[in-house]
Structure formats: structure tokens, C-alpha cells
A protein has these predicted regions:
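Bacterial Sec-dependent N-terminal signal peptides
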Residues: 1-6
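Non-catalytic cap/lid and distal C-terminal segments of serine-dependent acyl enzymes
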Residues: 19-291, 298
């Protein structure tokens, strides 16, 4: 305990993922004994047939070692966006220890950074009214378990009296869970900013776990800390779609919503788009719209 406490005060001289004024980004990694250090990121060009661990679409770039044993690389100017990356140290995937911002995409982790001065400013916490993100549990009779669900309510919801709100059911992709849209997807920040700018109507956004066999995201369920696997049994067998009305019932029993088809929307990314389409087909009187496209996350 003493040594762990002392570690809090160790000087952290090295910075990494430094966004420079010209929108280039500089990475630093101290590994004096390493023979080769590379950076894999979604900002790098990917060679044909190249696959980097869990990094989808990532390219691989050699870093340069200086006399102090620090490996460094600076990108070309990058577009405004949220980016992810990891290091490859002598072929071993490694998180950047000098950047504490790490996201998990189901079974893989990567560091992230944001280049602003553009559309990615929507991903940032800005000085606007903020909504509330609640981690809730609902009981599924069909799946015979309690399941975790994330629900965003807009700024002012608690003080808005009897006002009722439209609802968006936002579904994640194969590698995600109920936390995906609020971590990597920056859903709460985007909603706060769009609503403040008058570009989105204040709404309630419901983000469930689309893996029917799971209670909750890894580390949040009764299974404790276990090694997650990319695809759980039952993910694509229709159970999530079949019992989706249980989620609607929970939301409409606990929140002030406009409880009619015209004010319920559903959308999803990748697997979530597949689920959205099936739910809309199975329950045509329940939901007004369905967006199964992968470009759902586009905000410009």
C-alpha cells in the first residue's frame, strides 16, 4: 500500500499524444532496450492485408529512437476527429503509459485523443448545459435476468415538471455493449452540444446491451472481472429483438416520455443496425423510424 501510494508522486516528465497548434500530433514512448517500436493508429495509412491486433483499419508506422531511449513520432496535420492508437514494442501491442485516456472495445483496449477545431469539438465537454447519464438495471422476464442499461436525459429534465420527451433507442455494434456509445461514441457530449446549439431536440436516449446472453458490460455484471470474448452465444439469434418491448416498457414506466410511435425512434451501428431493422420489422406499430446505416455516427 505504501509503495502504491508513493507511486502517485513519481514525476511524470514524458508527455504523449500531444496535439500541436498545426493539428499534428506527437507521440513519445520510453523504451531504451527495445529494438523496434511502432505506432498503430486509425490516422495511419493501412498497408494491403495488414491487420493490427484489435485495431480495425489501423496502419503501422515506425517510430524513431533518440539518444535518451525515447521513441518518437509526429503525424502530418490531422482532420478534426477522435482517434485511437496503440504501440507495438518488438511486436507486442502496448498501451501508451503517458496517455491516461484509454477506451475498451469489448476485448481490446486503445489510447485515444481528440483533434479539435472542427466537428470533433462536438465530442468535447464544452461550457453548455449538461444532461444526466444514468446506469440503470431492468428485469427481463424473457431473458430471465436483470440487465444493465444506460439512459441519457437532457439538461433540465429534472426541473421540467410534466414535460414529456421523445426517445431514441441507440444500439451498439458487435464489439460494443451498453457503455460503447457513452465512452468511445461520446454520445452524452454530442447530445449536450447539439441540443445547446439548437441542432437537436431535447430527447431521452436509451442505450441497452445488445448481447442477449450478457447482464452487462465486462466488469459491471455479477461475473466480476473476466476476460471478455468478442461474440457471446445468442447475440444474433433474435432474443434481443424478441424481448425489446421489455426495454420500452421499463423506459415508459420510469421516465416522462411521449409514449407513442411517432416519438419513438431506433437506430444502430453495424450489429445495432441489424437489430434495429429486425425490431422495426417485428414490431411495426412500436417504432417510427429505423436507421441501420453505419454512417449513423456522422455529425457534420
Amino acid at each position: 500500500q505504501m509503495s502504491a501510494q508513493q507511486n502517485l508522486f513519481v514525476a511524470q516528465d514524458l508527455e504523449s499524444a500531444i496535439v500541436n497548434k498545426d493539428n499534428t500530433v506527437t507521440f513519445n514512448f520510453k523504451a531504451p532496450d527495445a529494438k523496434k517500436v511502432q505506432i498503430a493508429g486509425d490516422f495511419a495509412e493501412r498497408a494491403e492485408g495488414q491487420h493490427i491486433g484489435g485495431m480495425v483499419g489501423a496502419g503501422l508506422i515506425d517510430m524513431t529512437k533518440n539518444a535518451e531511449g525515447i521513441w518518437t513520432y509526429t503525424t502530418k496535420p490531422l482532420d478534426s476527429e477522435l482517434y485511437s492508437y496503440e504501440f507495438m514494442v518488438d511486436g507486442v501491442p502496448t498501451i501508451d503509459p503517458n496517455n491516461v485516456y484509454v477506451y475498451r472495445d469489448f476485448a481490446t483496449t486503445s489510447n485515444v485523443f481528440i483533434v479539435g477545431n472542427g466537428k470533433a469539438d462536438l465530442y468535447k465537454v464544452n461550457k453548455v448545459p449538461h444532461g444526466t447519464l444514468a446506469h440503470r438495471w431492468y428485469h427481463s422476464d424473457g431473458m430471465k435476468m436483470d440487465r444493465r442499461i444506460n439512459i441519457y436525459t437532457p439538461a433540465g429534465y429534472e426541473q421540467s415538471g410534466n414535460r414529456k420527451y421523445p426517445v431514441l433507442y441507440l444500439l451498439h455494434g458487435m464489439g460494443g455493449d451498453e457503455d460503447e456509445w457513452t465512452t468511445f461514441g461520446r454520445a452524452a457530449q454530442i447530445l449536450d452540444n447539439l441540443i445547446a446549439q439548437g441542432k437537436a431536440e431535447p430527447m431521452i436516449v436509451v442505450m441497452p446491451n445488445g448481447h442477449a446472453a450478457m447482464e452487462a458490460a465486462p466488469g459491471e455484471s455479477s461475473l466480476g472481472y473476466y476476460k471478455p470474448y468478442h461474440m457471446k452465444n445468442g447475440t444474433m439469434d433474435g432474443a434481443f429483438e424478441t424481448y425489446f418491448p421489455e426495454i420500452v416498457k421499463f423506459v415508459e414506466s420510469n421516465y416522462r416520455v411521449q409514449a407513442d410511435k411517432a416519438h419513438r425512434a431506433i437506430a444502430g451501428l453495424s450489429m445495432g443496425g441489424f437489430h434495429s431493422a429486425n425490431i422495426s420489422l417485428n414490431y411495426p406499430c412500436l417504432l417510427y423510424t429505423s436507421d441501420a446505416a453505419d454512417d449513423l455516427t456522422r455529425v457534420d
